[in-house]
Structures are given as C-alpha cells and as structure tokens.
Amino acid sequence: MKVQEYIKEDGSSPYQEWFDRLDAVAAAKVTVAKSRLELGNTSNVKWFDGIGEYRIDWGPGYRIYLAEEGKQFIVLFGGGTKKSQQSDINRAQELYQEYKRRKREAIEEKEKEAENKKIKKRKKR
C-alpha cells in the first residue's frame, strides 16, 4: 500500500512538522506504525467520518491521522497524542476536506484542458 504525506498548497506537510518534533524513541514507534500501514495493516486504525486514527499504544498514546484513497493509497495528515486528540481530529478533518477540494479542482482542470484540446482539434479541421 502506498503511504504519502499530505502536502498543503503552501508546500508544508503537517505530518512531517509533527514527526520532526518527536523524540527519537517516539519517532521510531511512529516509523514502525507507518511501515505497518505500507504493508496494508490497518488493524490499529479506528475510522470515523472518512478519517482514520492509527493508535500507537505507547507513551502518551500517539496517534497518526490518515485517509484511505481507494484500496492501495493512504494519505497522512498529521499526528498527536491522546491528550490533544479532539483538536488533532478536527485538524485532520479540515485537512481532509482541503485535500478533497484540491483533488476535485485538479480533476476539473484536467477535464477542461481535455475539452479545450478537443475544441482546438475541431477548429483545425
């Protein structure tokens, strides 16, 4: 399964920003969790409103927030701990909505480009 961080329009990655603040042991635990996701293991993920919360049963209860895109692709939105869970979920949901909007806009733009190419070909005839 392909696992990729969500990159915002400004080029930043909320997941990477969170990950970079972790200590070495926590970063190792999160890396193992990400590897499990890449292997398709979502048994530690609780799903709600399109967002998945991967629970790491260690330390302060680390979480990774994600969404599935089809059956072979996972998008990472960020992370947090049990203590900040509700605000982390809210942030992940905002990022997920932004992701879906940008994806929809990209599809619409490609469709417009394809239609414009067809029109130009017809005009050349």
Predicted features, each with a name:
Residues 1-61, 70-74, 81-125:
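Basic, Lys/Arg-enriched alpha-helical interface segments
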